[in-house]
Amino acid sequence: MDIQRINTYNDNQFSKAVLLQHGCFLVDGKPYEVEIISDYEAIIRGENQAVYAAVIGEFRFYTPHITQFYDKDGKKVMEYPRLSLLTLRLEQIQPSQFYVDEDKINAISAFIHKPQDIIIQVFPDKERYISLDGHTRLYYAFLKGWDCVRAIVETSDDWIYKIVDEAQKRGIYTPKEMTLVSHDEYEIKWNRFCDDFFACDGVE
């Protein structure tokens, strides 16, 4: 089974709203959607329910706080234990990324309307938390003047500390210090850093 996550915002096979949430997948070339409808719930759509578990597993790699899944008729498909959510101030969060893609900012503005809509993954570090994902959301919170976001605690490998060191060398200690760039510039700068970093560090 070949599962591909769709990372573009324009694809006629999918709902625009779900594309903006990054909840679209191709499974052996067939379209499947996972649409977030609450803090912990989502609807999964696609022709073959036999592959739903695999799609949900892929989806939850990025969004583990979503724990209940329903089909298009409202029947529960899968359920996981609910995760505890923290409320963190932006100043408590150390980014592990340097750049923010302005196209992604525009995309999330379609479905993030209040601070409570932002849920990220973090890793505890001394008195603070390292953000493992959700950097676009964090920067959007800064742009909107919001003080707090919500988070779930996850684990991470030691390489995250090396990326944090690189961020701090660039003066990035909180979300507001990341740099907003065009999509093309983001692809070049951030992807090049990641390629070089993981090649040198031997991380796969």
Name each region found by the language model.
Residues D2, N10-V18, H22-G23, K126-E204:
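Basic- and aromatic-enriched surface patches that contact anionic nucleotides/nucleic acids
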Residues Q4-I36, Y40-N48, Y52-L132, T136, ...:
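Short alpha-helix boundary/capping and kink motifs at helix termini
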